[in-house]
Amino acid sequence: MLRKLTVLFMCLTLCWTTVACGSSNTTSYQNSNPNISSNPIKQNRNQVTQGQYPVQQATYNDANGEYTLMLLNTPAGTPPMYSTTDLQMASLTEEEIQEGKTNYTEINGNQASLHIKPDFKIEYVHNVTETQTDPQTGRQETIIVRRESNFWTPFAGAIAGQVVGGAISNMLFRPQYYVPPVYQPGGVMTGYGGYGNSYDQAVNRYQERYQAPPAAVKNRQTLRATGVTNSTRSNNTR
C-alpha cells in the first residue's frame, strides 16, 4: 500500500512540475516579444480620466511625444494637469467660435481629443541631444544637453490652405492625430508635419515629407533613460 501511495505521489509531483514549467516558458516568451509601437501609451497616472474640460494651456515635449494639458473646472481636489501621448486634435469651426465655444478637451482614459481655435498656441519643448561616450562603459549614448522652447499653432493659416473649389475641407474639424513640423527657433511654428487617423499614419506622412522620423519617435528610441544632464537644467532657452 505504501509503495502505491509513493508512486502516486511521484506521478502527481511530475505532472505539477510539467505544468509549472510550461507556464513559466509561456510567460518568458511573451515578455521577450513585446508589441512595439511608434507611440507607446503610458500607464494612466492622471486623476482626471473622463469628461469634457476647458483647456487653459498645452505643452508638447519632443523627448517622448507627450502632451500636458492644464484643465479648468476639474472636480474639487483633483489636479488640473492631464498628460498623454495619445492625443488627437481638431480645429473649432467658425460657428463654434461665434457661439462662444472655448478651447476644450474630451478625455477618455489615456486617450483625449483637443479642440482648439486656430490661434491657440501649444508650447513646444525641444530637446537638443548629443551622442557621447560613457566613460564607465565605453559605449555611445544619446543624451539631452539642453532644452529650448517655442510655440506651435497647428491650425493657424491651415483653414485657408484647405479651401478647394470654394469649399473648406472638413478634415480639420474632426479629431485626428497630428505630428508637429520640424522644430524651428524664433517665430511661432505653424501647421503640421503629418496627420492621420492613427499616430503611425501621421508619422508615415511626416517621414514622406521630411525623409526622417519625427523628433519624438527618434528620441524615444535613442535617449538614455537618465539622459538629463546638469546643462539641461541650467540652459533652457525660450
What do the PLM-derived regions correspond to, one by one?
Residues 1-4:
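Positively charged n-region of N-terminal signal peptides that target proteins for export
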Residues 7-15:
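Hydrophobic helical h-region of N-terminal Sec-dependent signal peptides
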Residues 16-20:
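C-terminal motif of bacterial Sec signal peptides marking the signal peptidase cleavage site
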Residues 22-238:
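Low-complexity, glycine/proline/serine-enriched intrinsically disordered segments
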